[in-house]
Amino acid sequence: MTTKIKTLLDYTRDKTNFNSIERYVDYLARYIDYVAGGNVQADIVSAKEPKYHFLQYKADATHNVTRPFNSELFVGKDIFDCQRDDFFRLLKDISIAKEDDELRRTINRMVYSCQQAIGMTLDALPSAENNKAKKLNGDLFEVFIRLLIAEIGVTVKEMTEKVTVRANDQYSFDMNYQHDVMLYKGEELRAIGSVKTSSKDRGDKVFVDKFLYNKLTDLDIPHFAIYLNDVQRAGKAPKFHVNSTFLTAHFMGYTVKLNPLDGVYYCDITHLMQQNDILLKEIHTLDKLFVDDIWKFVGKEPVHSRTRYDD
């Protein structure tokens, strides 16, 4: 039976469907099958950067064109089974990727592809629902990252934290901080993370949050940021291309003059993020967080976290 875009949209719009890593991976498989089944009108190659493609849906999705996806990262039908198996093997013991660049790439590919499959599905919605779709996509990315962190054996929470601000040793007021990711060692908070599909709208905020949070609490808690990518569709049919949403000067200004973050991680790093020594030092692919840095944040060694993926 042929899958309809409406079926995929109905599934993605119900957040309860994405309550496990398996659900994200299963949805990627469904989307790959949908595309491979001849359900898209065109695969459009970016006029300026040919590794970026766009899909144009058929009449049942009013010929909408998707966001750009990196064809070098997005998992195709021909390699899906192998990538899925390696991904679940990594979740059992992330340390096996330490000296294996191909397994590190699998982390980036699978996280990127699972999330892009959701976002590209939501691109089939009418333009009047763009804001709702953007929020849903962002929420599901946050959930996915927290599920992955928990799966590799790190205690992670999401919460609104009340910070009491005192002046001259007297009560002044409370400030609420909404944290996407809080990493713990036992009961001790060890790091705070921001998770967004793009730095476009809130890239500055994470720098300010680190400065204010540590100033107000008299602590020195590491702050890090996770982004899916920083590219968006530009131009008009048939000459679509991509524009960067990464604000180089803003990032460098906050890094140099306010405070650097303790990690910035992307699934899809662009050439703009690699053009000088500061950016090369500060920005990394997502695998570095999961394989290396998260264990430094929480002060322990990687663990063989679960057994449910064992043969």
Specify the residue positions occupied by each region the protein language model found.
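Conserved catalytic cores of phosphodiester-cleaving nucleases, focusing on short active-site segments
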Residues: 181-183, 190-197, 206
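Short, solvent-exposed amphipathic alpha-helical segments in soluble enzyme
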Residues: 209-212, 242
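Arginine/glycine-rich "motif VI" loop of SF2 helicases in the C-terminal RecA-like domain
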Residues: 212-220
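Hydrophobic beta-strand segments of well-ordered beta-sheets in folded domains
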Residues: 191-192, 219-227, 262-264
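Domain-level recognition of nuclease-like catalytic cores that cleave nucleotide substrates
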Residues: 229-311
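Active-site-adjacent loop/helix micro-motif of nuclease/hydrolase catalytic cores
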Residues: 196-209, 235-237
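Interdomain/boundary linker segments immediately adjacent to catalytic/signaling cores
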Residues: 3-153
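A short acidic/basic microdomain associated with nuclease active sites
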Residues: 152-174, 184
